[in-house]
Amino acid sequence: MSDVTTDTMMHSVTAGIAVDIAEEGFDRVSAILSGIPGGANRAVGSALARAAAAGKTVAKRAVTQEYAISSSEFSNRTKNINNIQRGSNGEVSINFGYRGSVIPLRVFDTKVDRSGRVVTRVKKSGARQALDHAFEAKMGSHYGINERQGEKRFPVKELFGPATPQMMYSNENVMDSIEAKMASTYEERIEHEITRVLNGWGV
């Protein structure tokens, strides 16, 4: 099953369109807020945060339709990336998107029968499959679905499904929808956030 892994990597996905818009317009925002220390970063950062929230709503709806994961699990396991840096050459670099670790397989549609056999389904459209060498066990304080890495009892590794960023970028149509929502939300919010900083709102 390609959706099941023992890899414990962190994954991320970048919102390219929103980043391009924010970077291209940063000098204009800086000029408007030139008299306020850190004002441009605050305005752009706040607009990006709104864009991230809007994109996350689109992503959650699409991902939970495709994957056997709840909305709350998706939200809890998807973290925002929102960093603004200015290099020594004066150019602004924005790192913006989402990150998340692979998700324990037990969180998905995974069941253990009376004999201890593990049956799982990561995608809702997929058939449930038995994992012949997998078993449920408590390792330390954590319950998980584990698999022996050979004929002997050890070593054992926990099994995981994909991280939420993987779920997003594996579907081009979903990613396009997320990016479009983030970009449009940023463009809608940036003028309001500039006004907020100018007027000292929320400080």
Model segments located where?
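Short, Lys/Arg-rich flexible segments
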Residues: 2-203
